[in-house]
Amino acid sequence: LLFLSDMIKKESGGIINISSLASYQALPYFTVYSSSKAYVTSFTLGLYEEYRESGVKILCVCPGYTKTNFNIRAKMSSKPLAGYLMSSEEVVDQSLKAYSKGKYLIINGKINKFAKFFTSLIPTSWSLKLSRSIIKKGMDEKNW
């Protein structure tokens, strides 16, 4: 927000905040991560609505699992989701396209959009159990 007032005066500029698909539900074993990403999403969408007529573009990027070192640092295998991982370059490309179109939110990748939609249809308790199962399987994986 340091430069937001200057952008508003110029009626141009932009903010891109990186959140996560994890911002849309609590993730067992990654509670702090999903909670902090929920804050980023809520904060960014709130800013967007406050300043939508200011000429400043504000975008919240919510990628799902992406091919990065995150899994290594989290001591978790990416094998259970290997076929669904996007490259960071794909995430950036999609995000910049969304930004250039003036969108305020992007959930990167079709599988991630489906996952968000699907989890909104099922009871929270099921969604939590499903997340726990997927994450636990990745944490238990020995060959990564």
Which residues are covered by each model-predicted region?
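Active-site loop immediately N-terminal to the catalytic Tyr-X3-Lys motif
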Residues: 27-31
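A short helix-coil junction within the Rossmann-fold of NAD(P)-dependent oxidoreductases
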Residues: 2-11
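Active-site-adjacent segment of SDR/Rossmann-fold oxidoreductases
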Residues: 6-7, 25, 46-57
